[in-house]
Amino acid sequence: MDLRQIQYFIALFEDGSVTRAAKRLNIVQPALSMQIAKLETELRQQLFERGPHGMTPTDAARQMYRLYTPIMRDIDRARDQLSRQDAIVTGRVSLGMVSSEAESVLPESLARFNALFPQVEVSVADGFSAQLIDAVEAGRLDAAVINKPRGRLALDVVPLLDEEMVLVTSAALGPDLPPAIDLATLTGIELVLPTRRNGLRGVLDAALLAADVVIKPKFEIDLLNTIVQFVEQSAVATILPRVVVQRKVDESVLRARTIASPPIVRHIILVSHPKRPIGPAARALIDIIGEEIRRVTTGTPAA
């Protein structure tokens, strides 16, 4: 497998058509088809279902796309950095993140960032959204990735992504439930949720209030890892962002079910001080974090 094959695969995955992908790559269609067939042979996996309406990616293709697209973005970013006269970026980045995002994507994000910017020092703090807002306002953090609060902010705000919250149960011990859940009719299920000082609980409560739905958790815990482990080992369910549990869902340890009614979506935003612009290193780290969140939750990196 070489970089050219990966580029061809990504183009075909995104365009869904040999004709469109070949045009995008500026190559002839037989050359593209030959490289994809060669790639499938090397991997011993069928990557696309051929049909009259185009190329439909298989599960193997979706997994490959999730794994390789961030790598190609890093290569493009590194090439861009090296082509500039000011390629060596130095300094220090101080970033805050809500723990639900930090625990899920930060290790991979920092590894990618360090490979691109080895001379930049990084400090990351986690906490509740309100705490991180205070730290940005006081100048202790360059920026923070938080849950969007209900009130207005005196900081610069950049929307990063919208993420669904899902009902999570143990794959081995959890109750047998339909793939889509109506919380208004959910009965006989014990719930563990974050406490009310947690921004995730605020998102959940706001959605329930708007839909006139009432649920009462039996347990309230702020440590997300503890919530996840508790759910793994019991018949208790929880409601959390998909990014928090997706890996364990992929490993068939947990099950995540869509909440059809009321839909619960949290809005992730970036906040920074209007008098302290974000530098290029901080911006690069934030972009990588956004890509990792999309990769984990949907397989679609940030644009």
Where are each of the predicted segments found?
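Short helix-boundary/capping micro-motifs
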Residues: 10-28
